[in-house]
Amino acid sequence: MRWQRLAEEVREHQFRYYVRDAPIISDGEFDALLRELQELEDRHPDLRTPDSPTQLVGGGFATDFTPVDHLERMLSLDNVFDVDELRAWAARVEAETGPDLHYLCEVKIDGVALNLVYERGKLVRAATRGDGRTGEDVTLNARTIEDVPGELSAGGEFPVPELLEVRGEVYLRLADFEALNAAIVAEGKPPYANPRNTAAGSLRQKDPAVTARRRLRMICHGLGRIEGYTPASQFEAYRALSAWGLPVSEHTRRVRGIDAVIERVAYWGEHRHDIEHEIDGQVIKVDETSLQRRLGATSRAPRWAIAYKYPPEEATTKLRAIEVNVGRTGRVTPFAVMEPVVIAGSTVAMATLHNASEVKRKGVLIGDTVTIRKAGDVIPEVLGPVVDARTGAEREFVMPTHCPECGTELAPEKEGDADIRCPNQRSCPAQLRERVYHVAGRSAFDIEALGYEAAIDLLQSGAIGDEGDLFDLDEARLLTTSLFTNKNGSLSANGKRLLENLDAAKDRPLWRVLVGLSIRHVGPTAARALAAEFGSMERIEQASVDELAATDGVGPTIAAAVAEWFTVDWHRAIVAKWRAAGVRMVDERDESIERTLEGLSIVVTGSLQGFSRDGAKEAILARGGKAAGSVSKKTAFVVVGDAPGAKAAKAEELGVPILDEEGFVRLLAEGPAAVAAEEPESG
């Protein structure tokens, strides 16, 4: 029977997730199974028994610690997965309460639930969720969490209640998780799969000293039983918790109406990786507590709250092989070849593994079932192996000793480097084609007609010997290629377009020329800084390491890489060829533009209507300012457009003046005296 098989499968995964802290499928795959079971029971209500996995909260408590009853049940949350389902939930709520409600929008932390009980302000018990009625006592371990006070603070406006039961989420910050994994892999142990499971296992250590070393954190997000105080709203409850010294999220917002809720959901869907911990959705709650009581709850979840789950960014798949790629600077990078799997709306079959040390740190073997993540446009990443799924047939990856493209012996550039490189920079076929393709990239010369296949064809046909020959290409040499030649032997339309693109690219600004040279560590930010400081390729070439390092935004590592690059004869030959072909090597300062931002550091975050990202940076640089990438106390202004990231919040925290786009335009035209700090409304 389908229901029986599905229920047993869900129960097994619940056991692995909640009790063993060792799941073998992703959260998204589990959600899909549970949803299928719920839909089956919706069609056949007689199947919905009290012990069905759809009716239980969590997977039951583990037996390692003393069972303890919660004062009030710890309910779970129902989930929605798209805006239509969210609107349908809100419609059901507002049919009962009336329209135009205030909702609280909270980030949904991907952690483990914890219940704290305070009597007369002192912590007396901490317990895991368990089955919602009975959990396990982890008081000693909870006391090691920095965010959990042993005694509540006097609340001023909010007197400390006689009895307080508060719920929250225990989690690991991503940086702490990475540090923990690095440490245990160095000891020869397999890495942990993800922060959530690691937090759960850390909370249930028998030795509290082990828990203390794990650097767990906590955010409070709800109340159980409370005596001596009744909050009028969820928002007020959070103010009270904060006054008592309990941690609450700084990302919670109170909004009116479901449209505003959907805006918050969309915002955090785009910015979920701007937070120090993992989130997997938004929790939306009716704010007014009297309405919460009216709406009530089902056997497992409140009707006044819902979890909007973002599309899964993690999945499990089979690691078929580990191969290596040679990049434009000679770096040899292992990458994973996997059975294709759909994540975040796209099919993923390959992911970088960075270097041999990273393969070892992650503990992955060829043949493993692995967990992979793809966050929006971010390159897919292998998180680690599902150790419980191993069969014994897996094998270790061995890094090659010679370049797979040219056969040159591989070696680290200097002792202690994690990366190994092919030293045959000048003629290694892989490095050549990657450099030619890089010249055409959007951050360099932005040559639309020169794609990856074109780069390969130009080199293989002999039309060019290296990137130095690009700007001297003519019709005769293009006719030696297959890609740019028609069947009748004439130049194709794409060939003509390539020649036009190359001619136009000769007049690109100096910073783009610098990026196109493939100097290690020199991306658009450093290139802009060098071009603004020195103004010509000749002056950059002649500058000392100290002079280069003194450039704001460059520093010693980039300076050394630039100076070293210009000591190589064939590198200088590329510059000479480009110069001879008419590529502009000097930035002529437009004297008509006033230096209104001389010495000021400006950060732009979010999308502006009248400026592209590069356009905003160039406008700042042209006026003598620095287009910085991060906010600090030295930042003069932060310009905030649509959908700003964490930089806006950082500016608020540091008291840095915030401008909208209109203020930015005035700042460019008239300087800092003409603008006042403008803080956009948060939603």
Swiss-Prot record:
- How is this protein annotated for GO cellular component? cytosol
Q: Where are the transmembrane segments?
A: none
GO terms of molecular function: DNA ligase (NAD+) activity; metal ion binding
Keywords, A to Z, come to: DNA damage, DNA repair, DNA replication, Ligase, Magnesium, Manganese, Metal-binding, NAD, Zinc
Q: Which residues form the active site?
A: 108 (n6-amp-lysine intermediate)
Any idea of its EC number? 6.5.1.2
Cofactor(s) needed by this chain: Mg(2+); Mn(2+)
Which SMART domains does this entry report, sorted A to Z? BRCT, LIGANc
Q: Which residues bind Zn(2+)?
A: 403, 406, 422, 428
Name the source's superkingdom: Bacteria
What are the residue boundaries of the BRCT domain, all occurrences included?
592-681
Chain sites annotated for binding NAD(+): 27-31, 76-77, 106, 129, 169, 285, 309
Q: Name one GO biological process term.
A: DNA replication
- Catalytic activity line of the entry: NAD(+) + (deoxyribonucleotide)n-3'-hydroxyl + 5'-phospho-(deoxyribonucleotide)m = (deoxyribonucleotide)n+m + AMP + beta-nicotinamide D-nucleotide
Q: Which NCBIfam families match?
A: dnlj, PRK07956.1
Similarity comment: family membership: Belongs to the NAD-dependent DNA ligase family. LigA subfamily.
Primary role:
DNA ligase that catalyzes the formation of phosphodiester linkages between 5'-phosphoryl and 3'-hydroxyl groups in double-stranded DNA using NAD as a coenzyme and as the energy source for the reaction. It is essential for DNA replication and repair of damaged DNA.
> What name goes with this protein?
DNA ligase 2
Source organism per entry reads Nocardia farcinica (strain IFM 10152)
